[in-house]
Swiss-Prot record:
<dbReference type="GO" id="GO:0006726">
    <property type="term" value="P:eye pigment biosynthetic process"/>
</dbReference>
<comment type="function">
    <text>Has a role in the biogenesis of eye pigment granules. Eye pigment granules are specialized forms of late endosomes or lysosomes. Biogenesis of pigment granules in the eye requires molecular components required for protein delivery to lysosomes.</text>
</comment>
<dbReference type="GO" id="GO:0031409">
    <property type="term" value="F:pigment binding"/>
</dbReference>
<keyword id="KW-0844">Vision</keyword>
<dbReference type="Pfam" id="PF23757">
    <property type="entry name" value="TPR_HPS5_insect"/>
</dbReference>
<dbReference type="InterPro" id="IPR035431">
    <property type="entry name" value="HPS5"/>
</dbReference>
<comment type="similarity">
    <text>Belongs to the HPS5 family.</text>
</comment>
<dbReference type="GO" id="GO:0048066">
    <property type="term" value="P:developmental pigmentation"/>
</dbReference>
<dbReference type="InterPro" id="IPR015943">
    <property type="entry name" value="WD40/YVTN_repeat-like_dom_sf"/>
</dbReference>
<dbReference type="InterPro" id="IPR056446">
    <property type="entry name" value="TPR_HPS5_insects"/>
</dbReference>
<dbReference type="GO" id="GO:0005737">
    <property type="term" value="C:cytoplasm"/>
</dbReference>
<feature type="repeat" description="WD 2">
    <location>
        <begin position="67"/>
        <end position="106"/>
    </location>
</feature>
<keyword id="KW-0608">Pigment</keyword>
<keyword id="KW-0677">Repeat</keyword>
<dbReference type="GO" id="GO:0006622">
    <property type="term" value="P:protein targeting to lysosome"/>
</dbReference>
<keyword id="KW-0716">Sensory transduction</keyword>
<feature type="repeat" description="WD 1">
    <location>
        <begin position="25"/>
        <end position="64"/>
    </location>
</feature>
Length: 830
């Protein structure tokens, strides 16, 4: 029966409170704080820290599991129903075994999340050997464990896999894909490739939840392209996305309050399609249900709720099929098959069943799917599905397939016309077109020996270029339909206007080709979708550089979304190439980032590489690569807003533009000093000072080279400008400083304090402008500190006293402590 003729109802409503509360009927202080259910069990967490286990079918009490974890905040039963994950409200996680006798240490080895955090969501993997848990800090962690002799859970380890900004609301999983929702966004994680993608671009303020729904067509043959992701949005809206994380459409479920009042009773309700725009009641009010956690019923319907309402949605047809407000104070909901279980206030538990009228088998079990038929269907891709239908029709009269009815012929008559429609209009149409175009391309590129030469890079424009001799290419296959008297649908024509891209960008550009609609002469680019991968083009070869750049960019995007450091993944790629090749890849990666409108693309590329680069390699690479690294080092220290603000606060020479002082630190210091050391050793001083002019921290390295080379004409000025105690003491001891050096230093100090003047370290011209006084520099420029260092390195204290007396008129009264004179007299007496 068509979905528009189905009717939905809530049946078998019952209250289970009397059975559930039986174990502690005489203790009113125990309250349920959470619960979960499976085909076999109910499990309730309580404020006492204990877990209560029940049989779901008979509602009989089975066992109590005491624990020392305190109030339980979250529970989750594994798929095999042998383990229960529990999390308390103070950040501890425990794993219980339902097959062990209850004991005080039933939770095995509790894990502490650390910090002020608590578990907000659990998600088991299919084999139940791993458990994902999300907490209130926005961290998703993977718990791996094993059972030892069925006695205790050992070797539990906690590995953070995703770091987000705020609380995790819900986690769901489909094969290798992990869906994580927070209060502001939804993230799709490919756990096999360690790739992360945010679903949609607009953040939300509230519970952003996700779930996957697998539609159930009449043949029960589901392709991955039919699996959908649904994310809740503010204002009773849902985002529908595919498994690549691309938002397909938005569902609006606002309804007028007056209209909602007519659907409050618990009975069979005819589904009604909602308008795209919200309707208003006569008083102008709108009924908005805040979608929090999404539950899937048989992976076909969606269940959402608030404190007093249940809504059941058919997401494929964008309809609310059931609504009831009979229950109040709903705190927790769980779903098993078509059964819905509710935990409300005062320890009340209800059950209700979803029924579809007009459907012979609304919820078939997975076991009813014929495995041979399913496997046979999976093996037929592209043109082979057409061949299968024709062969079955001719050889078996369209009725038998491996001794059973063919699932492809159960719902439709297999005619050539219908087969061609399904192939050309369906998802295989472009595959067929690419097969023919690929063959034509090979025929045109045959070598003199007669063997076809496959292109090294994929030229998308050439692949999709129409050919008069190719019916599939001419009109995207619609010419073939026209021969059979079949009209192409408008949506098919619109879909074919857009060409597939290898690496889709936000601006509609691709890495190896540009997606242009028909009539590309207009100059407008068609925005495309961002994907994890482009499986449609997997059959074609790309250049090694382009494939590597794509991988680097995917890793980069994953690191941005997950807030994790993928240095090991970058290193695995870079280890396969020499420096010259890596530089070439980074330049291409920068171009790709710019096409995707990534701000500061050069900065991000260099940070990726500098986390991998070993400074000692700078002595062995070619000049072009070294120049690239030098420029990247400057970019890393001058691009970020905080770095620019720090540089703007520094005084600089009005004549030559060099900074008069140095910053306290810099990024990638070892790389910068290694570059400076390389150029200095080869007397390439212009390269050195070009770096110093942009990154003034390197004045410290230059000063060390001055001390090493005994450049007495530069050392005193550098030491004073940099206000570095380590450099002053090193210079005073290694040169060593004589009386004349101290005289120069005192004159620089007097010029600074009286005229706010400093000497440029590059052009030796005096420049006005007082430096900002920070605590280390202020202490360095005090007379007591300078005289203390001088007294420790000068030969005769009497000479130092004479020098001080010479500049007595320029030294403020009280600037020199009496203890200095006492020390001079004591040293002279010795």
């Amino acid at each position: 029966m068509d979905a528009t003729n189905k009717q939905y109802a809530l049946r078998d409503r019952a209250e289970l409170s009397a059975f559930v509360n039986q174990p502690f009927r005489n203790n009113s202080r125990i309250k349920f704080t959470c619960f979960d259910c499976s085909p076999k069990y109910f499990v309730f967490g309580a404020n006492s820290g204990s877990l209560y286990l029940y049989d779901r079918i008979t509602t009989s009490f089975l066992a109590i599991f005491p624990s020392q974890l305190g109030t339980i905040g979250k529970v989750s039963i594994s798929h095999n129903e042998k383990q229960i994950a529990i999390g308390n409200q103070t950040g501890s996680i425990g794993i219980l075994s339902t097959e062990l006798a209850p004991s005080t240490d039933g939770e095995g080895q509790p894990i502490d999340l650390g910090g002020p955090a608590f578990v907000t969501s659990f998600c088991w993997t299919e084999d139940d050997r791993e458990l994902y848990c999300g907490d209130s800090r926005g961290i998703v962690s993977l718990i791996q464990f094993s059972l030892f002799m069925g006695r205790n859970i050992l070797n539990i380890s906690l590995h953070p896999v995703l770091l987000l900004e705020n609380r995790i609301v819900q986690i769901d999983r489909y094969k290798d894909l992990l869906l994580v929702s927070t209060l502001s966004k939804c993230v799709l994680c490919n756990t096999a490739r360690e790739e992360f993608k945010q679903i949609g671009n607009r953040p939300r303020d509230g519970h952003a939840t996700t779930t996957t729904t697998t539609p159930s067509p009449p043949l029960m043959i589901v392709d991955e392209e039919d699996v959908r992701i649904f994310c809740s949005r503010p204002g009773s809206r849902l985002w529908e996305a595919d498994l690549e994380g691309n938002v397909i459409r938005t569902h609006q479920f606002k309804q007028a309050a007056a209209a909602a009042a007519a659907q409050q009773q618990l009975q069979c309700l005819q589904e009604s399609e909602l308008a795209t725009a919200p309707t208003e009641a006569p008083d102008g009010t709108l009924m908005v249900v805040p979608f929090q956690v999404l539950y899937s019923i048989r992976r076909q319907l969606l269940l959402v709720h608030d404190r007093c309402q249940l809504l059941i949605i058919d997401p494929l047809h964008s309809k609310i099929v059931l609504r009831t407000d009979e229950f109040t104070d709903i705190t927790h909901v769980a779903v098993v098959d078509e059964w819905i279980y509710l935990l409300t206030g005062e320890n009340r538990v209800f059950q209700v069943r979803v029924e579809i009228q007009g459907d012979e088998d609304p919820f078939p079990t997975p076991g009813m799917v014929d495995e041979p038929c399913l496997e046979s269907r999976k093996q037929k891709q592209g043109v082979y599905i057409l061949d299968s239908m024709l062969n079955n029709n001719n050889n078996n009269n369209g009725k038998q397939m491996n001794g059973k009815e063919s699932p492809l012929l159960l719902s439709t008559e297999a005619t050539i016309k219908e087969a061609l429609v399904s192939v050309v209009r369906g998802k295989y149409g472009r595959n067929i077109k690419q097969m023919f175009m690929g063959y034509e391309q090979q025929q045109q590129q045959r070598t003199p020996s007669g063997a076809p030469e496959r292109p090294k890079t994929l030229n998308l424009t050439k692949i999709y270029e129409p050919s008069r001799s190719n019916a599939f290419a001419n009109g995207n296959g619609h010419a073939l339909l026209a021969e059979f008297g079949i009209e192409a649908e408008v949506e098919d024509l619109e879909c074919d206007d857009m060409m597939e891209e290898l690496v889709q960008t936000r601006t509609g550009q691709a890495l190896l080709g540009t997606a242009m609609p028909n009539g590309a002469g207009t100059g407008k680019q068609q925005p495309g979708k961002k994907k994890f991968s482009t499986s449609l083009l997997d059959g074609y070869e790309t250049s090694e550089d382009d494939a590597t750049v794509r991988n680097l960019y995917l890793i980069f995007r994953s690191s941005i979304i997950s807030n994790l450091n993928f240095a090991d993944r970058y290193a695995k790629i870079f280890d396969e190439y020499d420096t010259e090749t890596i530089v070439r890849l980074l330049r291409k990666l920068e171009t790709l980032m710019e096409e995707n409108e990534e701000p500061n693309a050069r900065l991000k590329c260099m940070r990726i590489y500098f986390h991998y680069l070993k400074p000692e390699l700078l002595w062995e690479i070619d000049a072009d690569s070294r120049q690239f690294i030098k420029d990247g080092f400057i970019v890393c220290n001058t691009t970020d807003g905080a770095d620019r603000a720090r540089l703007e606060r520094l005084a600089h020479c009005a004549a030559c533009g060099y900074y008069l002082e140095a910053t306290a630190s810099c990024h990638y210091r070892e790389i910068g000093t290694s570059l400076l050391q390389y150029y200095w050793s080869r007397k390439e001083y212009d390269e050195c000072f070009a770096m110093v002019k942009r990154v003034p921290y390197l004045w410290r390295t230059i000063t060390r080279y001055y001390i090493q080379d005994r450049r007495e004409d530069k050392v005193v000025q550098c030491v004073w400008n940099l206000a570095d105690s380590e450099l002053l003491e090193r210079a005073a001891g290694e040169l060593p400083f004589e009386l004349d050096h101290w005289r120069q230093l005192f004159e620089l100090a007097i010029a600074y304090h009286q005229r706010h003047e400093m000497i440029c370290l590059s052009c030796d011209k005096p420049t006005g402008g007082r430096l900002e006084d920070n605590q280390p520099e202020s202490q360095f420029r005090q007379w007591n500190y300078l005289l203390g260092v001088a007294l420790a390195h000068i030969r005769s204290p009497t000479e130092l006293l004479c020098l001080v007396r010479r500049y007595a008129d320029n030294i403020p009264r009280g600037a020199i402590a009496p203890s200095f004179y006492i020390r001079c007299l004591l040293l002279e007496a010795k």
